[in-house]
A protein has these predicted regions:
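Extreme N-terminal starter segment of soluble prokaryotic enzymes
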Residues: 1-4
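Conserved, mostly hydrophobic/aromatic
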Residues: 22, 78, 116
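Conserved acidic residues
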Residues: 18-19, 75, 112
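Phosphate/ribose-phosphate-bearing ligand recognition and processing surfaces
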Residues: 83-126
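Short, conserved "active-site rim" segments that organize catalytic pockets and cofactor/ligand binding
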Residues: 7-59
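Short, basic/glycine-rich phosphate-binding loops at helix/coil junctions
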Residues: 72-86
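N-terminal short beta-loop-beta anion/metal-coordinating cradle
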Residues: 50-75
Length: 126
């Protein structure tokens, strides 16, 4: 079942009791602005950054997905580095690929309920 809602992503994650939340992250997996910042604030900035920097040495590639614990958020966090409009030759195709990879990962990991914000529409300007 698909349900489309608007509002605060953190409040909705609690309200709808989802298993995971998708984080449109930056390639460094550092605290960011917008949705990424809200997720890091809810999860615990120090906890999540320490976990990410200890687990992965390399920066994320466009459309790469990494999964972490949610710490204080108590939901798994599915990080995806979406395309940045100004850095892509064909940004719309890259964005389609981004969503496709995300849905494939959700099926692979057997998630039943996930909050997904609009990807690449804030800082990434798609």
């Amino acid at each position: 079942m698909l349900k489309i809602v608007s509002g605060d992503i953190i409040e909705n994650a609690q309200k709808y009791d989802v298993e995971a939340i998708v984080n449109p992250n930056n390639k460094y997996m550092d605290y960011g602005c917008g949705v990424c910042g809200a997720i890091y604030d809810a999860a615990g900035i120090e906890q999540i950054e320490t976990y990410c920097h200890n687990k992965w040495i390399k920066d994320m590639e466009v459309n790469e997905i990494r999964i972490t614990p949610g710490f204080y958020l108590q939901k798994e966090i599915i990080h995806i580095y979406a395309p940045i409009f100004s850095q892509e030759k064909n940004p719309i195709e890259k964005l389609k690929e981004c969503y496709l990879k995300l849905f494939e990962k959700l099926i692979e990991e057997k998630y039943n309920s996930v909050i997904i914000p609009s990807l690449a529409t804030g800082f990434h300007r798609l």
